C-alpha cells in the first residue's frame, strides 16, 4: 500500500461535478449485472429524451455549478424499433446524429462540457462526436473472452473485448481524451484482471489518450440476473487499486474509485494510490448504480480531508489535453471562457 501511494505527484484528490443524463435506457446488450437497461415495454423506461428535457436538466445543473454533462445511453439503442420511431419523430435517422446535436446544444446554450459514454462506436461515429465532446469514455470492463460464455456477458455482444479494445484504440487514433476502466467481481480471475490493466496500459503507451482508469467493483442489487452473485472482497479491491497505481506509476493517468460504491472503505483506496473520485453529481442519481447514492460534496470533502488529502474540482477533460493537439477551437474557446 505504501509503495503504491508514494508514487503520487501531489496530495490532491480530484472529482468532476457533473449531471448524469441518460438519453435512453434501451440497450442491445443484456449484462447479468446491469441496473441500467430497461425494455421498451417497461412503462418507466426512458425511450429517448427530447432536447427540451435535456436542456431543462442542463439548466438545473448550471444552477448547481456543474461543469460536466455526462450523456449515457444503451449501446446501439437505435437498433430497437421504439428508439427508431422516436428518432424519426425528432427528425433523425440514427442516434449518433442526435447525440451530436445534443452535445452541440450543450456547448452553445450552457456552460457545461459534454462527455459522452454510449458504448462502442465506429471510427466514423467517434470522429463525428469528437467535434462536440471535451472527452469521451467507455469501460473496457475485461479482456476476458471467457466471460462471453458466462452469465455476465453471454447476452451482450458489445462486451466482446476485441470490439471494445478496437473502440478505445480508435479513440486514441482520433486523439480523443478518454476514460476507461475495469469491472471486478463478475467472474474474472486475478490473471484476467492483470491482463485487462495491461491492455489499457498498452493503449496508453501507443496513443497517450487514456486520462483515467476506473477500478469499479461489482455490487449486487435486487432484480438483476446476478442478484445472488458474491461481490468482490475489500481485499480484491485493495489489490486491484494498488496494481493499477503501480502499473501507471510513471504516468499522469489517474486511478479512480467510485465513492458511492465504496462508502465505508473509500478512504483506504486513497491510501492505496487512487487519486480521483470521478464524476459526482449534486443534482442527479447514478443511473448505472441507482441503489448507491452519491456522497454529498461536503461529505466527499470530509472523507478526503480525514484521509490526509485535499479535494479539488476538475473538468471532465484533464488539463494536459486542453490544447489544439487534442481539442478543436470551439472546445478550447469554451474551456477558456469557463476558466
UniProtKB/Swiss-Prot annotation:
Signal peptide span: none
Record text on cofactor binding: Binds 1 [4Fe-4S] cluster. The cluster is coordinated with 3 cysteines and an exchangeable S-adenosyl-L-methionine.
Reactions mediated catalytically: 5-amino-5-(4-hydroxybenzyl)-6-(D-ribitylimino)-5,6-dihydrouracil + S-adenosyl-L-methionine = 7,8-didemethyl-8-hydroxy-5-deazariboflavin + 5'-deoxyadenosine + L-methionine + NH4(+) + H(+)
Pathway(s) per entry: Cofactor biosynthesis; coenzyme F0 biosynthesis
Xref: InterPro entries: Aldolase_TIM, CofG_family, Elp3/MiaA/NifB-like_rSAM, F420, rSAM
Ranges for domain Radical SAM core: 13-258
Pfam families found in the cross-reference section: Radical_SAM (PF04055)
Cofactor: [4Fe-4S] cluster
Binding positions for [4Fe-4S] cluster per the UniProt entry: 27, 31, 34
Entry keyword set: 4Fe-4S, Iron, Iron-sulfur, Lyase, Metal-binding, S-adenosyl-L-methionine
This protein's record includes keyword 4Fe-4S: yes
Presence of keyword Metal-binding: yes
EC number(s) on file: 4.3.1.32
One Gene Ontology MF term: transferase activity, transferring alkyl or aryl (other than methyl) groups
Domain of life according to the entry: Archaea
Function: Catalyzes the radical-mediated synthesis of 7,8-didemethyl-8-hydroxy-5-deazariboflavin from 5-amino-5-(4-hydroxybenzyl)-6-(D-ribitylimino)-5,6-dihydrouracil.
Similarity comment: family membership: Belongs to the radical SAM superfamily. CofG family.
Quaternary structure and interacting proteins, as annotated: Consists of two subunits, CofG and CofH.
Designated name of the protein: 7,8-didemethyl-8-hydroxy-5-deazariboflavin synthase
Species lineage: Archaea, Methanobacteriati, Methanobacteriota, Methanomada group, Methanobacteria
Name of the encoding gene: cofG
